[in-house]
């Protein structure tokens, strides 16, 4: 965990993600990425020179078979406030509207519910669990499927909602996330959603895996190019415009 904490701290500092006095909500989906983000920030908050507070926040969409009680217990052990918001999104998407392509609507409704909850609690900063591999895959998806160079940014300010998104796990590789989740015995919540899975991202994962046999430093080269090029928002120390 010390290695991951070091990577998270460097990412936070490189992109000036956290200021003194911040309250940072971690969007907890129950997956390994968001739970590790929560764990890392909770530990970082104990010694980081800019004092900040961490809260966990989950939008419970009503998917049958999903329980976040284990996450609640974990938050108590971490000493982190846990905000749970129940919204009948599953019912709307699958039972009322019977969407053929439900993921887009579900994501839109969850973002809206999250924004409302943050506003109600006076929180203006949220940490998301995207990691190193997510960034590389998103970059390639943008290039291959959209014909452009693009990716989410380490720090994104959403002017419409006055919310800042940060991604402190960006220097952490997926294999490190997997290993840490096992070692820490994180209370991962299995997602039984009938639409769970992202075909295009899986295609890109398989493409990268097939190329890494010949080019083992492929992901490192792509990630480095994103910072050196740099993509908008990716230049370390603000060197991105």
Describe the function of each predicted region.
Residues 6, 10, 14, 73, ...:
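Charged/polar, solvent-exposed surface patches and flexible loops
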Residues 61-63, 89-91, 156-159, 172, ...:
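Residue-level detector of flexible, active-site-proximal loop/helix-junction positions
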Residues 54, 133-210:
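Catalytic subdomain that performs nucleotidyl-dependent activation
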Residues 102-107, 128-130, 171-175, 214-217, ...:
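A general structural signal for short secondary-structure boundary/capping elements
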Residues 107-119, 155-161, 208-227:
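Short, basic, helix/turn surface patches
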Residues 186-241:
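The feature marks non-catalytic terminal segments
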Residues 1-137, 145, 175-183:
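ATP-dependent adenylation/nucleotidyltransferase module used to activate substrates
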Residues 2, 35, 65, 108, ...:
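Electropositive phosphate-/nucleotide-binding environments in soluble metabolic enzymes
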């Amino acid at each position: 965990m010390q290695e991951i904490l070091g990577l998270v701290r460097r990412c936070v500092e490189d992109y000036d993600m956290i200021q003194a006095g911040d309250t940072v909500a971690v969007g907890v989906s129950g997956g390994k990425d968001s739970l590790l983000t929560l764990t890392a920030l909770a530990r970082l908050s104990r010694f980081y020179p800019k004092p900040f507070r961490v809260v966990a926040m989950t939008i419970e969409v009503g998917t049958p078979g999903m329980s976040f009680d284990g996450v609640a217990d974990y938050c108590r052990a971490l000493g982190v406030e846990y905000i749970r918001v129940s919204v009948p999104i599953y019912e709307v998407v699958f039972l009322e509207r019977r969407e053929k392509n439900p993921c887009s609507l579900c994501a839109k409704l969850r973002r809206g519910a999250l924004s409302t909850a943050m506003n109600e609690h006076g929180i203006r900063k949220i940490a998301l669990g995207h990691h190193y591999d997510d960034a590389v895959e998103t970059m390639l998806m943008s290039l291959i499927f959209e014909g452009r160079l693009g990716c989410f940014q380490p720090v994104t300010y959403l002017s419409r909602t006055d919310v800042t998104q940060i991604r402190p796990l960006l220097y952490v590789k997926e294999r490190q996330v997997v290993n840490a989740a096992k070692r820490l015995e994180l209370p991962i919540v299995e997602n039984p959603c009938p639409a769970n899975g992202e075909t295009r991202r899986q295609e890109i994962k398989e493409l990268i895996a097939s190329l890494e046999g010949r080019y083992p430093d492929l992901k490192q080269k792509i990630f480095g190019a994103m910072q050196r090029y740099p993509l908008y928002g990716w230049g370390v120390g603000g060197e991105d415009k």
